[in-house]
């Protein structure tokens, strides 16, 4: 009999998506969120990693990763490039140099058909990206890390069929983590390979957690509350010493990264266990987890609706709509940005999901 799926893991994915959007919204606690929120996704991917030592299994795994990660990366960045000139007319992007007065912003020029073709070729090999697709760095990193881990796993099982691969994978993860830390200090991250070296250890950490097992589901409530409180305290204690910016492969040190990531996992897992006991909340988080890719792709664009409404009410130059990632800070603006960044991609995802279900149903009857 198959082991029942842990509903908390579905909730964890949804919580991670909420934290990602919240971290981009101008929320005052973003530094705390950045300690662990992206590491959580690498660890979840490692937790669910499963592959036999057969060549066919490796091919299936690679094809699934291409369809689930590489293709959305290319299509999303290409779509944003195709829409570039339209976005310029709508002030979603701008060529006005005054935008440079706002930190982290850039001037954008019009593109030609030749530009679109050339840039799409670059997206195909993970060379660069678009501003509105800025969160897709994670998709690139996860694609590279998961394929590398699978190739190493396949090679180890072929070379040493009688031995457990966990120890050599752990040794490689440790070596790559050291390399990743050195790359971060040197500012080297060509094709995101510095991130790959650092993130490999987080992927392995997820595999290790799966192997060791989660706490018993019938664990006492006081024990779970204590674990969550301790994890929260550890993260608070780490906060004065720095934060984690995996998008740029920046973190204070390898031990800091591992401790923050592990503490974040414990905190989010215990929160997810609580959420899983509340059917409505659990369903909402599971829906967000299923829509993870649309949210990653569309939440920056969705923020523009909040900025546009703010400009209509408060007034301001049209070019300010292009402020990235958000125009307004302070007050409850972060709440409005977060709501838009979650709700609009989720709504946009529903027609695709329904169409896919109908197609699969028709194919099933054929």
What do the PLM-derived regions correspond to, one by one?
Residues 1-366:
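Alpha-helical transmembrane segments and their immediate juxtamembrane cytosolic regions
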């Amino acid at each position: 009999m198959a082991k029942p799926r842990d509903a908390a893991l579905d909730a964890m994915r949804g919580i991670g998506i909420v934290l990602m959007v919240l971290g981009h919204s101008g929320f005052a606690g973003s530094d705390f969120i950045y300690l662990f929120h992206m590491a959580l996704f690498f660890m979840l991917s490692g937790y669910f990693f499963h592959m036999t030592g057969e060549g066919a299994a490796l091919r299936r795994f690679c094809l699934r990763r291409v369809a689930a990660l590489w293709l959305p990366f290319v299509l999303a960045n290409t779509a944003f490039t195709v829409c570039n000139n339209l976005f310029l007319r709508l002030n979603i992007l701008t060529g006005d140099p005054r935008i440079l007065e706002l930190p982290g912003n850039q001037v954008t020029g019009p593109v030609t058909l030749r530009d679109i073709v050339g840039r799409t070729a670059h997206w195909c090999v993970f060379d660069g990206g678009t501003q509105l697709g800025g969160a897709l760095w994670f998709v690139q990193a996860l694609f590279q890390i998961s394929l590398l881990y699978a190739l190493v796993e396949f090679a180890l099982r072929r070379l040493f069929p009688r031995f457990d691969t966990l120890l050599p994978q752990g040794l490689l993860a440790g070596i790559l983590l050291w390399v990743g830390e050195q790359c971060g200090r040197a500012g080297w991250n060509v094709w995101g390979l510095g991130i790959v070296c650092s993130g490999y250890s987080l992927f392995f950490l997820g595999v290790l957690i799966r192997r060791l097992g989660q706490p018993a589901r019938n664990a006492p409530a006081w024990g779970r509350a204590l674990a969550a409180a301790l994890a929260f305290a550890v993260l608070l204690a780490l906060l004065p010493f720095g934060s984690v910016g995996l998008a740029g492969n920046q973190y204070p040190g390898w031990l800091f990264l591992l401790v923050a990531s592990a503490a974040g996992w414990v905190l989010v897992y215990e929160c997810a266990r609580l959420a899983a006991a509340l059917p409505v909340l659990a369903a909402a988080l599971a829906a967000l987890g299923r829509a993870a890719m649309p949210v990653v792709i569309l939440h920056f664009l969705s923020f523009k609706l909040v900025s546009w409404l703010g400009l209509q009410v408060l007034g301001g130059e049209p070019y300010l709509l292009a402020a990235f990632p958000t125009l307004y800070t302070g007050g409850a603006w972060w709440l409005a940005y977060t709501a838009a960044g979650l709700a609009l991609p989720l709504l946009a995802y529903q027609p695709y999901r329904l169409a896919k279900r109908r197609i699969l149903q028709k194919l099933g009857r054929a």
